[in-house]
C-alpha cells in the first residue's frame, strides 16, 4: 500500500500531481504488488497513477520525469504538458516532495540575489516573467478538453492565478522602488543601501 497521491486528512489542501519518485528499483523483488492510493480528485490522480504504472512495468529502467511527461500527455494532451509542468511545480509539496516548489524557489532566489546587488529592474523582470508564465499556463489549462480534470483542480488553479497576480504586483513595486531610488541618487544608479534607507 503506497500512500500516494492521496491527499486526505491534513493534506486536503495539497494537489499531488508531481512525479512518482523515491521508490527502489529492487522493490519488485521483495513485493508481490503495489497499490497506489489515489486522491479524491480521480482524474487528477491519473497523472501520478500513470507514472506509477510505468514504474511497476519496469522499475529498473524507470525514469520519473519521462514517466510523468508521458502520463501527463495522456491526461491533458501533449500541447498542455508544459503548462501542467509549470502548474505542477507550484503544487510540488507532498509526502514525496516535502521541499518548497523547486522552480518557483529558484526564480525567487534569483530575483532576491539581484536585489541584494541593487539590480532591481533585473530582479523585477525575472519575477514578472515567471508570474506571467504562471498566468498563461493557468489560462491554457482552463481551456483543456479534459473538463473533468479542470473542474477538479479549479480551486488550485484559482489560487495559483492569485499568487501569480501577487507576484506581478510585487515586481511592479520593485520597479517603482527602483525608479524612486534612481531619482534620489545623482549618478542614477540604484544601490541596495539606498533601498534600505
Predicted regions and their residues:
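C-terminal functional modules
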Residues: 60-197
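Catalytic-core regions of glycoside hydrolase
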Residues: 1-65
Amino acid at each position: 500500500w503506497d500512500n500516494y497521491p492521496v491527499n486526505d486528512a491534513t493534506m486536503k489542501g495539497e494537489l499531488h500531481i508531481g512525479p512518482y519518485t523515491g521508490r527502489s528499483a529492487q522493490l519488485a523483488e521483495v513485493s508481490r504488488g503495489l497499490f497506489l492510493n489515489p486522491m479524491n480528485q480521480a482524474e487528477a490522480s491519473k497523472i501520478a497513477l500513470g507514472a506509477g504504472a510505468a514504474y511497476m512495468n519496469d522499475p529498473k529502467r524507470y525514469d520519473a520525469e519521462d514517466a510523468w511527461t508521458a502520463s501527463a500527455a495522456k491526461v491533458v494532451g501533449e500541447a498542455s504538458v508544459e503548462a501542467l509542468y509549470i502548474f505542477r511545480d507550484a503544487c510540488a509539496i507532498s509526502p514525496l516532495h516535502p521541499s518548497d516548489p523547486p522552480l518557483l524557489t529558484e526564480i525567487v532566489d534569483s530575483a532576491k540575489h539581484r536585489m541584494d546587488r541593487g539590480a532591481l529592474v533585473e530582479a523585477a523582470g525575472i519575477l514578472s516573467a515567471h508570474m506571467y508564465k504562471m498566468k498563461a499556463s493557468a489560462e491554457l489549462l482552463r481551456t483543456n478538453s479534459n473538463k473533468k480534470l479542470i473542474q477538479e483542480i479549479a480551486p488550485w488553479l484559482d489560487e495559483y492565478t492569485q499568487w501569480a497576480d501577487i507576484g506581478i504586483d510585487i515586481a511592479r513595486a520593485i520597479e517603482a522602488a527602483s525608479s524612486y531610488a534612481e531619482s534620489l541618487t545623482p549618478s542614477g544608479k540604484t544601490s541596495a543601501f539606498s533601498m534600505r534607507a
